[in-house]
Amino acid sequence: MKPPILIIIMSTVILGTMIVMTSSHWMLTWIGFEMNMLAIIPILMKKFNPRAMEASTKYFLTQATASMLLMMGIIINLLHSGQWTVSNNLNPTSSILMTTALAMKLGLAPFHFWVPEVTQGISLSSGMILLTWQKIAPLSVLYQISPTINPNLLLPMAILSVLIGGWGGLNQTQLRKIMAYSSITHMGWMTAILLYNPTMMFLNLIIYITMTLSTFMLFMINSATTTLSLSQTWNKAPLITSLILTLMLSLGGLPPLSGFIPKWMIIQELTKNEMIILPTFLAITALLNLYFYMRLTYTTALTMFPSTNNMKMKWQFENTKKMIFLPPLIITSTMLLPLTPMISILD
């Protein structure tokens, strides 16, 4: 893809998300979603092979269905209230339709089936955009309508997402699918806290985006797409491989890394709201994610795959590509836990 075209498309993706986040009119919100969806499809098809085309088609069909449900909810709310203003006094029927539509856009269970398939069929850079930037717009609308969301609809979705995100990643060897199931799990944690402390959801989102961006950038540097290819990078670029493993443990929520912060604060907030069963279940199912990240860490760092070369390290390491934003992203992805007491605005 030529640079001028890529700049125009990326600008449209960013503009669509910004329109959704800043608009107070439901029609503008819907237009922002459509701009974002139509602009992201050429980015998903950047590789232009049958797998990428299939993934883009699946993404388009899912997002188009979600947009249709969203528009239906907007129209029902218009007929009920007589206004287009984005507010938190929605009609119950339109609230259910909008919540379902936004859950489809986010990839929450049981509407999660498209996320691993689409992520696996596209390039690492496209997958990075899909699993980070594309989550911002639906979550911002969920934040705006959170007072009217039915807990009996959203909480089962959150619990199912955490459970399926953990189970689905257990037998995966493809790194993109592992990241997709990790995304489903994190979306489940965010929607679980949405009804009790919406601001904490954005803290979780910021940390999740930081960790996912760092991990995908390191995958791109190593050109690693499977567990096998990742394990073979240890003797080429040991520093980068060790950083990937640290980031994966952070994504799994292992203390004392940054990924533990949102889990810790969400469990604390749910306990304050006299919810005992939900945080207990979330903490237990989080072990599924931590298990497959620990297993990936073990196979990559603590075992040596069969090789024709008996040398444990190459005499000259590969000259890897430089990424300017990578060092600060890695630092924030792994070392934020001591700063947790400073986050007093959420109390």
From Swiss-Prot:
GO terms for cellular component: mitochondrial inner membrane. It is a multi-pass membrane protein. One of its GO terms (biological process) is mitochondrial respiratory chain complex I assembly. It catalyses: a ubiquinone + NADH + 5 H(+)(in) = a ubiquinol + NAD(+) + 4 H(+)(out). It comes from the Eukaryota. Its EC number is 7.1.1.2. Signal peptide: none annotated. InterPro entries: Complex_I_Subunit_2 (IPR050175), NADH_DH_su2_C (IPR010933), NADH_UbQ_OxRdtase_chain2 (IPR003917), ND/Mrp_TM (IPR001750). The keyword Secreted does not apply. Core subunit of respiratory chain NADH dehydrogenase (Complex I) which is composed of 45 different subunits. Interacts with TMEM242. Belongs to the complex I subunit 2 family. This is NADH-ubiquinone oxidoreductase chain 2.
